[in-house]
């Protein structure tokens, strides 16, 4: 059975990476690509995709991925969360909004937060494409971290599969809390990595 996924910010930097990865799994996902910016719409058009109106996408969504700039998440989620059907999953790509409490929380929704760890600086990638993929999500294998912030335990598996697909290729998905993720990214990860380099 395919899951109906609404991808908010589908034509942006992160949105395009997710768009490209979700299109590899038409058997798993029926994706509504939501985009309002002129450049984002052009990026989707280059992929042969026409954006879906936000209200239409929200009404049908089993999961909503927030591929949005952090500064917009609070405002946009206050608009879309009331439109979601009970049992839907809100997927954040960064812990900041969930940890700071800027997203409205509904008891009947699942909130899943996931973040890439990015490819290791020292790795075993051999293809030129993978070696040039410093961010991950295109060709280089990397780890991710995820948290089931709110929702039934059985939703972990749904979130895990979605996270692995949007960030593919993934080596491991390490389960953490939103608080742990907020501490690790960016403070610990970037400070530690910069010191080592």
PLM region descriptions:
Residues 11:
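Conserved glycine-rich cofactor-binding loop
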Residues 15-16:
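N-terminal Rossmann-fold NAD(P) dinucleotide-binding loop
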Residues 25-47:
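NAD(P)-binding Rossmann-fold cofactor-contacting core
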Residues 28, 84-88, 107-109:
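A short helix->loop->beta-strand "cap" motif at the edges of active sites that frequently abuts
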Residues 48-61:
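Short acidic low-complexity segments
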Residues 58-102:
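Rossmann-fold NAD(P) dinucleotide-binding segment
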Residues 94-184:
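Rossmann-fold dinucleotide-binding core
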């Amino acid at each position: 059975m395919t899951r109906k996924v609404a991808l908010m910010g589908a034509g942006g930097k992160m949105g395009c990476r997710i768009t490209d990865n979700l299109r590899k799994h038409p058997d798993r996902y029926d994706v509504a690509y939501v985009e309002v910016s002129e450049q984002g719409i052009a990026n989707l058009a280059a992929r042969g995709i026409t954006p879906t109106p936000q209200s239409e996408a929200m009404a049908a969504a089993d999961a909503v991925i927030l591929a949005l700039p952090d500064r917009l998440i609070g405002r946009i989620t206050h608009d879309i969360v009331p439109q979601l059907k009970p049992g839907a999953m809100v997927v954040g790509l960064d812990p900041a909004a969930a940890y700071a409490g800027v997203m409205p929380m509904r008891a009947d929704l699942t909130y899943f937060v996931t973040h890439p760890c990015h490819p290791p600086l020292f790795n075993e990638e051999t293809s030129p494409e993978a070696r040039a993929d410093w961010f991950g999500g295109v060709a280089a294998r990397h780890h991710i971290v995820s948290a089931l912030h709110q929702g039934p335990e059985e939703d972990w598996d749904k979130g895990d599969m979605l996270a692995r697909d949007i960030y593919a290729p993934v080596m491991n998905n390490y389960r953490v809390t939103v608080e742990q993720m907020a501490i690790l990214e960016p403070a610990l990860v970037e400070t530690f990595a910069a010191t080592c380099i």
